[in-house]
């Protein structure tokens, strides 16, 4: 066993089970371990869904149980400037951003990494992400987590090999039930705590109410792809491609009782376009263009290559061909049509277990013949 006793690791303690068990595993590996709780959002309303106080108490209880110090830091200003404002801009433009990816890039593996190294003297940071790191020829690669159901590499594709080299992911080698089992054996307060969902650091508040505070909603018509007016939407920003719930429209004589899905957003005219059936041709894409590219462990690609892509989290791998258009953009052609490819979301590329990198979906290629010009 390598001597880790001189190495200091700061674990990002979220108040959840994954970071709790990560801290314990690192202690078992002989590291000097301390925790850091990041406050990244200033609550302004004191409502019960702001769970930061509960999360901090849980993180403190875990650190007390493990005999670890817990530091706290406030990154709310960095979060607002580098994550939240961009998030709002994307919604204003009719796109659907992924704030968790931006938060990992700007906060967890930038602000936190710098603070841990410079202020706390850390050799490494650690998080409870379900990913693995592999060092090859002096560069760190990002690998999928061992638990295919929980793999979170999709959210970490913006990391550089330099950032990865300073990061540890202890639970990436485990499956989730094993993580919970360890927490239960240790009698950690987080053992049965449910996994967090919702916007990174904003928690599980009602998304529509939350967004409406910062962006004025503009109600408008819901139209079918055939030009029928079937309802009203409360704001395009509340809807995303492929969405089924919350449309408030029933079946039609022509389409029967098949559920309605959002197939497009006409931002210029404030129209929400819908069609019936989850495989409606208007919902399908044969490819996409991705921009703001990031390759984890290498320079920009210069030649076409084969790989698989995910256009959203927990999606099945999609075989595709990636062709560079320039250093900042690639064209992706799927082997088979894919539903609900959404501009603003990320396309993330893999070869086997290795996450190569990804980019933001700029535009999608509709199924030929599905859109009337």
From Swiss-Prot:
Protein name: tRNA-specific 2-thiouridylase MnmA
UniProt keyword terms in alphabetical order: ATP-binding, Cytoplasm, Disulfide bond, Nucleotide-binding, RNA-binding, Transferase, tRNA processing, tRNA-binding
SS bond list: 103-200
Keyword Plastid on entry: no
Function: Catalyzes the 2-thiolation of uridine at the wobble position (U34) of tRNA(Lys), tRNA(Glu) and tRNA(Gln), leading to the formation of s(2)U34, the first step of tRNA-mnm(5)s(2)U34 synthesis. Sulfur is provided by IscS, via a sulfur-relay system. Binds ATP and its substrate tRNAs.
SUPFAM superfamilies for this protein: Adenine nucleotide alpha hydrolases-like
GO molecular function list: ATP binding; tRNA binding; tRNA-uridine 2-sulfurtransferase activity
Single Gene Ontology BP annotation: tRNA wobble position uridine thiolation
Statement: the UniProt record of this protein carries the keyword Magnesium: no
EC number: 2.8.1.13
The family this protein is said to belong to: Belongs to the MnmA/TRMU family.
Catalytic site: 103 (nucleophile), 200 (cysteine persulfide intermediate)
Interaction with tRNA: annotated segments: 150-152, 312-313
Reactions this protein catalyses: S-sulfanyl-L-cysteinyl-[protein] + uridine(34) in tRNA + AH2 + ATP = 2-thiouridine(34) in tRNA + L-cysteinyl-[protein] + A + AMP + diphosphate + H(+)
Subunit structure, interactors included: Interacts with TusE.
Originating organism: Yersinia enterocolitica serotype O:8 / biotype 1B (strain NCTC 13174 / 8081)
Positions marked as site (Interaction with tRNA): 129, 345
UniProt-annotated stretches for the region Interaction with target base in tRNA: 98-100
Binding site residues for ATP: 12-19, 38, 128
Signal peptide (residue range): none
